[in-house]
Swiss-Prot record:
Family per similarity comment: Belongs to the c/mor transcriptional regulatory family.
Organism: Haemophilus influenzae (strain ATCC 51907 / DSM 11121 / KW20 / Rd)
DNA-binding region: 35-55
Key words, A-Z: DNA-binding, Transcription, Transcription regulation
Keyword Phosphoprotein assigned: no
Gene Ontology terms for molecular function: DNA binding
Xref: Pfam families: Mor (PF08765)
Protein name: Mu-like prophage FluMu protein C
Protein function: Required for transcription of the phage late genes.
Transcription regulation keyword on record: yes
Source species, domain of life: Bacteria
Length: 72
């Protein structure tokens, strides 16, 4: 790594943050509009946490879509 990044600083997120981001993306993909109770059980999260994740993921998707649209 020193060969590629020697003298430069960079941010490497903790493993927990990466796992959380992957989990959140998976929850968003599995969501079908009617399966919140199933997601609560599967991921052992509260209803409010599931809805917060869905809200955040929806916002991320919109931003990605807008970026794609702007570069086309």
């Amino acid at each position: 790594m020193a060969h590629y990044f020697g003298g430069k600083s960079f941010y490497l997120p903790a493993g927990d943050k990466i796992k959380e981001a992957l989990r959140d993306a998976q929850i968003y993909q599995e969501f079908n509009g009617k399966n919140v109770p199933d997601l609560i059980k599967k991921y052992r999260l509260s209803e409010s946490t599931i809805y917060a994740i869905l809200r955040n993921q929806r916002t991320l998707q919109r931003k990605r879509h807008q970026m794609d649209f702007n570069f086309s």
